[in-house]
């Protein structure tokens, strides 16, 4: 009998053994020379993962929501106009946060399963000057993938800051912060970054830092104020001790370990691995006669899949049966559709074998509940899609990404 269940929700995810080992190491002082080196190295590695050699990184004890709050607290003042581009629950959350800081907020909400067109965004940007716009790269509630690159270009065109909520995308989806002109890219530690919950991570452009420095009013939120955190980040990068609030020492040791694993794999290869696995997994889901929330594969996230329950199948019963097969997936999050769909995470060190286990558990549960499908169909479809991808890659230029997806990356050692 298996002693634990495979955690396949959209965060927290399954973590590398090396990361968990680092988390369990003896806690040192936050001004110990060894820890100062770890913190400084983590800040440097963030620039590599974010593709932002010019950015200012922040590592703060907190959640992804704190990272969102920090961006708003430091860049938005009362009366500023903010445009929120929403594809689900977390777009609306950014509106709530901006409203708390006195912003005049306009929200563009995409129809369920769709994204906002660039034409609609530009039309709104023409109506008045927006100080900032927010983009949810992957909305964890819907599995919708937005394309931040052209939106960031529009923001630059209209002298507007661009803030990317990358909570469910950083280290899983393609992001080139400096090249694309994104001003803030933020995330939490527990998703594709691959570290247990507890760290808010941000990368801030020189432009955004200058806007912050030229604020007319003090930052209202004491804990989120970059005035308190910037000297700490700079000190650690210079390998000097510093203190504002005690950092979560073990989490940061785990973060350095995970960032090294990510950088060893390589961002290009890591993103491609996520894309290949997600495409095959969606094909497997489709073969089970399940409809995903994203209406096209082009806007479907590569870090999670959101799909509707089949007609006549009780969601709670299905999730329980899957859990009895030692796999944990998540229910819905959108309040108006919470009981109508489920979500499966496939990010970080996820492997082929993980997704085979998920499809097998899902397929068995559906069959037990009377869903009319062919036994083994999802596994066959998934495997065939992977083999097709591998053959295509081999023919083009080699198969490094394909080798990565077949490795169980949770057993990779990094010096």
Residue ranges of predicted features:
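Conserved PLP-binding catalytic core of the aspartate aminotransferase-like
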Residues: 291-322
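Active-site phosphate-binding strand-loop segment of PLP-dependent enzymes
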Residues: 115-171, 184, 192
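Conserved beta-loop-alpha segment that forms the PLP phosphate-binding cup at the N-terminus of a helix
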Residues: 55-83, 87, 91-95
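Conserved active-site segment immediately N-terminal to the catalytic lysine
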Residues: 178-190
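PLP-dependent enzyme catalytic core of the Aspartate aminotransferase-like
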Residues: 2, 336, 340-415
